[in-house]
């Protein structure tokens, strides 16, 4: 069980049903429940973290705002962004929250290296950065020794909604995406047109770092009501 991971591709979904489904999964899981990673693209939404301050939303306009229970401040999710929710029993894996954050950041850093993109984490602000521009946001919640929420990696999306907020609470934080970094040198091997182009690499890096060897892949199109 400690080596087994279920990876679910949920396709494109609204935020709130998936958020509620994460709660249900975490509330109902027990020691025999497999760890899971959910891959999803969200319809446009701003999500406020537990510590989210209203002043960091500058002009939401027609994009809805959802008050979430993850760590961190406000961020934006939209089509073309790879969201991975990491539902792991940390006690069973014998890792702490800080170690999990480091593993997730290194998963993204290693994934980006496949595209010859150099990136790094920052001790003062969780996430992954390319030349101090943010390419991946990170926010987690722990309940009953289990993690939920996860990462949001910008692949090929409309970045303009980030200008309506102070991303993750940082005024003037510049956001960047993978497609813009590789579009002039794209090949069949390092294509970054769609989130699905990056899914296999991300999962490979995550399962290597977190030592999963028995991986089951599922595709779901349900709306998690």
From Swiss-Prot:
Domain BPL/LPL catalytic: 31-214
Active-site residues per Swiss-Prot or TrEMBL entry: 168 (acyl-thioester intermediate)
Gene3D superfamilies: Bira Bifunctional Protein, Domain 2
Pathway given in the UniProt record: Protein modification; protein lipoylation via endogenous pathway; protein N(6)-(lipoyl)lysine from octanoyl-[acyl-carrier-protein]: step 1/2
Feature type site, description Lowers pKa of active site Cys: 134
GO biological process, one term: protein modification process
Enzyme Commission designation: 2.3.1.181
Record GO terms (molecular function): lipoyl(octanoyl) transferase activity
Subcellular location: Cytoplasm
Residues reported to bind substrate: 70-77, 137-139, 150-152
Top-level taxon of the source organism: Bacteria
InterPro entries for this protein: aa-tRNA-synth_II/BPL/LPL, BPL_LPL_catalytic, Octanoyltransferase, Octanoyltransferase_CS
Keyword presence, ATP-binding: no
Reactions catalysed, as given in the entry: octanoyl-[ACP] + L-lysyl-[protein] = N(6)-octanoyl-L-lysyl-[protein] + holo-[ACP] + H(+)
UniProt entry keywords in alphabetical sequence: Acyltransferase, Cytoplasm, Transferase
A Pfam family this chain is assigned to: LplA-B_cat
GO cellular component entries: cytoplasm
UniProt record similarity statement: Belongs to the LipB family.
HAMAP family per UniProt: LipB
Function: Catalyzes the transfer of endogenously produced octanoic acid from octanoyl-acyl-carrier-protein onto the lipoyl domains of lipoate-dependent enzymes. Lipoyl-ACP can also act as a substrate although octanoyl-ACP is likely to be the physiological substrate.
Miscellaneous: In the reaction, the free carboxyl group of octanoic acid is attached via an amide linkage to the epsilon-amino group of a specific lysine residue of lipoyl domains of lipoate-dependent enzymes.
Protein name: Octanoyltransferase
Gene expressing this chain: lipB
């Amino acid at each position: 069980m400690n080596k087994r991971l279920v990876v679910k591709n949920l396709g494109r979904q609204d935020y709130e049903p998936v958020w509620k489904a994460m709660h249900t999964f975490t509330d109902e899981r027990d020691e025999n429940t497999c760890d899971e990673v959910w891959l999803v693209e969200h319809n446009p939404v701003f999500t406020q973290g537990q510590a989210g301050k209203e002043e960091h939303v500058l002009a939401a306009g027609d994009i809805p705002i959802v008050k979430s229970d993850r760590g961190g401040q406000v961020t934006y999710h939209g089509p073309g962004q790879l969201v991975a929710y990491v539902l792991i029993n940390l006690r069973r894996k014998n890792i702490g929250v800080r170690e999990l954050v480091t593993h997730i950041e290194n998963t993204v850093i290693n994934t980006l290296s496949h595209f010859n993109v150099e990136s790094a984490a920052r001790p003062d602000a969780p996430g992954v950065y390319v030349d101090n521009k943010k390419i991946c946001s990170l926010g987690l919640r722990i309940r009953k020794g289990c993690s939920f929420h996860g990462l949001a990696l910008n692949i090929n999306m409309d970045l303009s909604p980030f200008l309506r907020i102070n991303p993750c609470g940082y005024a003037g934080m510049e956001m960047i995406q993978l497609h813009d970094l590789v579009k002039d040198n794209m090949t069949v091997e390092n294509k970054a047109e769609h989130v699905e182009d990056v899914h296999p690499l991300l999962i490979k890096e995550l399962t290597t770092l977190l030592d999963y060897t028995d991986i089951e892949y599922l595709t779901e199109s349900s709306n998690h009501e």
